[in-house]
């Protein structure tokens, strides 16, 4: 039987790796992938709380989180596609139109 | 199941999930990181199977691996990205990002060291009771979620549509 803290440590590790990747990369698509990693870490935490409290609410919140992550991927990829198509820019350091 | 075998499998999944998520953010080619993300999502589905959540495993495989990863790979293929070799991969202050992430991780480890696991665990989860809960108590968030999905679909189509560059009032 695996204790609860192991799953929480796994979730914390994956969330930190996703956070580091979101900060130190400059590709827009890799930043979206790091967002997916962070969503999955939080989903593991929700599912483990659902398991150890013998309650199904955590699994329903994982369902909602997966749907919101799908929406975020669709909108983010559409915005990146519009940026690449109109300006040819793929890196977050080069988007300087609003800098004035 | 024998608890030793269970813990051995858990340690395998911990190590492989960590290595795969590091490989996503460290690989040079962007299509390689997409495929590392695919294997990562399949391992997360296996972790859901550990937690007696079979329905979530199916949803994870169908939605993430079948939907979101296909979307990522199609977007990478459409954009035809070759600019990765012109630029540096990491930003200038990436050391600061690493230090921030490790401080966050250390704080979470200190906080999570005192967690006690309760005795009564979820014995088995059937889709029947999950659907009853979803359609009775969480019915309004479910409907709002359907509206959010519809708006995201329409907005994605409108944003990504190829617009004519110069209109008539020029």
From Swiss-Prot, chain A:
Q: Which GO terms describe its cellular component?
A: NADH dehydrogenase complex; plasma membrane
UniProt-listed Pfam families: Oxidored_q2 (PF00420)
Q: Which GO terms describe its molecular function?
A: NADH:ubiquinone reductase (non-electrogenic) activity; quinone binding
Q: What is its main location?
A: membrane
- Enzyme Commission number(s): 7.1.1.-
The GO annotation for biological process reads: ATP synthesis coupled electron transport
Q: Where in the cell is it found?
A: Cell inner membrane
Q: Which domain of life is it from?
A: Bacteria
Membrane topology is: Multi-pass membrane protein
Tell me which HAMAP family the record gives: NDH1_NuoK
Q: How does it assemble?
A: NDH-1 is composed of 14 different subunits. Subunits NuoA, H, J, K, L, M, N constitute the membrane sector of the complex.
The name under which this protein is listed is NADH-quinone oxidoreductase subunit K
In its UniProt entry, the species of origin is given as: Thermodesulfovibrio yellowstonii (strain ATCC 51303 / DSM 11347 / YP87)
């Amino acid at each position: 039987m695996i204790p609860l803290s192991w799953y929480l440590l796994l979730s914390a590790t994956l969330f930190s790796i996703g956070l580091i990747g979101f900060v130190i990369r400059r590709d827009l698509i890799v930043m979206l992938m790091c967002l997916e990693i962070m969503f999955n870490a939080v989903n593991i935490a929700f599912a483990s709380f659902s398991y150890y409290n013998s309650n199904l609410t955590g699994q329903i919140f994982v369902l909602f989180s997966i749907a919101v992550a799908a929406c975020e991927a669709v909108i983010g990829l559409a915005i990146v596609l519009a940026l690449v198509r109109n300006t040819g820019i793929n890196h977050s350091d080069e988007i300087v139109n609003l800098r004035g | 199941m024998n608890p030793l075998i269970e813990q051995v499998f858990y340690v395998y999944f911990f190590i492989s999930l960590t290595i795969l998520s590091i490989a996503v953010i460290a690989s040079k080619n962007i299509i390689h990181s997409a495929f590392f993300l695919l294997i990562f999502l399949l391992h997360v589905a296996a972790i859901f199977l550990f937690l007696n959540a079979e329905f979530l495993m199916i949803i994870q495989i169908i939605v993430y691996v079948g939907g979101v990863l296909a979307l990522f790979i199609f977007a990478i293929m459409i954009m035809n990205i070759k600019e990765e070799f012109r630029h540096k991969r990491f930003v200038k202050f990436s050391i600061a990002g690493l230090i921030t992430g490790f401080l966050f991780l250390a704080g979470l480890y200190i906080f999570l060291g005192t967690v006690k696991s309760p005795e009564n665990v979820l014995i088995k989860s059937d889709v029947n009771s999950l659907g009853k809960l979803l359609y009775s108590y969480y019915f309004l968030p479910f409907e709002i979620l359907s509206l959010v999905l519809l708006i995201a679909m329409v907005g994605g189509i409108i944003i990504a549509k190829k617009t004519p560059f110069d209109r008539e009032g020029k």
